[in-house]
């Protein structure tokens, strides 16, 4: 009980400090954030077996954005290092992201081993349309380089499409619903099947208020019809 109380007070203190810092740095093009999640689920796929920490730093200027992010399960079952750049204009965003998984590629792999035949990197290109008059988004993405290969070593260009809608009750309460599908015989279906719905997600986001400070939180229910799996996760967010 004392440990739970200590953890709560620590989170409250951290949130207070980060919000205070945020007010001072609101005009900076740089940002930093930390997400704590009970489980890492992305596009209907489970990564790791334990709560996961996601530190991230970013830079944004006149539509250009760059980021570096990590993902670390507390039991060591998953590690991830991501880099990305994107450009947004009006309702459209295009970008490229690099995903690297030290826990999955083995000791023989190296971060700077960039030969496409045996690299551990997964490089993805994507485009997103986000409506300004209606709260709808559409994303198309495809792995274009790296470890996205079948057993024969063939580059599979695994592609994914997602359509989502956000309904806002007020500034601090909204629910987002989305459906995502694998478009070809690729990674999302273990290279075994073509078009399939792999991600149905309902996410509720709100913020706990402590005086003038807010702690953003979210809860998500995720269903992967192809794998016949469902998940429920919760996350806390801290940012400067």
Indicate residue ranges for each PLM-predicted region.
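Transmembrane beta-strand segments that form the barrel wall of outer-membrane beta-barrel proteins
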Residues: 34-40, 63-74, 94-102, 109-111, ...
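Outer-membrane beta-barrel "beta-signal"
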Residues: 202-208, 228-240
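Short glycine/proline- and aromatic-enriched beta-strand/turn motifs that initiate or cap beta-hairpins
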Residues: 20-73
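Short loop/turn motifs that connect adjacent beta-strands in outer-membrane beta-barrel proteins
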Residues: 21-29, 95, 130-135, 168-176, ...
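Outer-membrane beta-barrel translocator domains and adjoining extracellular loop/strand segments
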Residues: 44-48, 78-82, 105-113, 148-155, ...
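Detector for outer-membrane/organellar transmembrane beta-barrel domains
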Residues: 113-186
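Residues that define the transmembrane beta-barrel architecture of outer-membrane proteins
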Residues: 28, 49-53, 60, 77-81, ...
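Cleavable N-terminal export/targeting peptides
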Residues: 1-29
């Amino acid at each position: 009980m004392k440990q739970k109380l200590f953890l709560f007070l620590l989170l409250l203190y951290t949130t207070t400090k980060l919000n205070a810092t945020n007010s001072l740095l609101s005009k900076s093009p740089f940002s930093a954030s930390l997400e704590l999640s009970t489980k890492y689920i992305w596009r209907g796929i489970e990564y790791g077996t334990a709560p996961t920490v996601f530190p991230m730093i970013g830079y944004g200027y006149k539509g250009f954005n760059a980021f570096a992010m990590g993902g670390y399960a507390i039991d060591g079952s998953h590690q991830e290092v991501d880099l990305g750049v994107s450009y947004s204009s009006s309702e459209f965003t295009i970008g490229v992201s690099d995903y690297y998984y030290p826990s999955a590629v083995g000791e023989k792999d190296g971060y700077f081993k960039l030969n496409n035949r045996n690299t551990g990197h997964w490089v993805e290109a994507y485009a997103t349309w986000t409506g300004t008059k209606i709260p709808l988004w559409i994303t198309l993405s495809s792995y274009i380089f790296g470890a996205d290969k079948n057993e024969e070593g063939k580059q599979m260009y695994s592609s994914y499409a997602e359509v989502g809608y956000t309904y806002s009750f007020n500034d601090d309460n909204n629910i987002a619903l989305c459906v995502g599908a694998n478009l070809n015989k690729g990674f999302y279906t273990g290279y075994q099947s073509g078009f399939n719905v792999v991600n149905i997600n309902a996410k509720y986001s709100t913020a706990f208020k402590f005086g003038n400070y807010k702690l953003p939180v979210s809860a998500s229910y995720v269903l992967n019809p192809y794998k016949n799996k469902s998940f429920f996760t919760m996350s806390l967010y801290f940012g400067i």
